[in-house]
């Protein structure tokens, strides 16, 4: 399972990165957090009493929200592009 997650992570970085090996841009960070949030949401559907994971999910959602707010303030066109690419609503 860890190998599959690593492959997904590499694909996300190559797709959303501004250059090769770009892991720090807001787009990459938002896309990686979105993937982790989706996986954790699936986990919580099966394990509804896993409160430690639920707290981690809430922290990730808050971090993604702050990154989206930062990106909106820096460049609105990049913000709108990442929302449409990831299927997020704001």
Curated annotation (Swiss-Prot):
SMART domains: Ribosomal_S15. NCBIfam families: S15_bact. The keyword Cytoplasm does not apply. The keyword Hydrolase does not apply. The lineage of its organism: Bacteria, Bacillati, Actinomycetota, Actinomycetes, Micrococcales. Belongs to the universal ribosomal protein uS15 family. This is Small ribosomal subunit protein uS15. SUPFAM superfamilies: S15/NS1 RNA-binding domain. InterPro entries: Ribosomal_uS15 (IPR000589), Ribosomal_uS15_bac-type (IPR005290), uS15_NS1_RNA-bd_sf (IPR009068).
